[in-house]
Amino acid sequence: LGRKAVVLNPPYSVLLQSKGLLKYAWDTHKYHDLLLAASFEEPLRYEKYVKKVLFGREGANVSIFDEVGNQISTRDGDYLRYRSIYQSFAQLARDPEGRYYQAGVFYAGEACGLGFRRGGLIIDNGASFVGHFVE
């Protein structure tokens, strides 16, 4: 086949990619300022919430609901075979043109990058990457 290298994710990466980690974090540190309520059983009541699949990618199979359960926004995808998780909604930063931003911090032994994904209410695979440089 002529391959010189094969790159595999280590098994623990599956844990870090699973949104089930969000529920575990919530269950072990309920009401922490930096965490959102999360549940496997049912949607959160009387508050805006998001339904996601455990192993979805780039906004696929994500839906946002208002406080009474009306769907506000949704994205189809190929991950419906996975279990769903419900999480409190957190409003992303928004610019004057109505675009939303999701921050990302990158580490390689130390903080080395800051970037934002810019897109719609559900950040998906059509989102732009907006890099930043900090001196």
Q: In which residue ranges do the predicted regions lie?
A:
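Domain-scale recognition of functional cores that engage charged ligands
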Residues: L1-E135
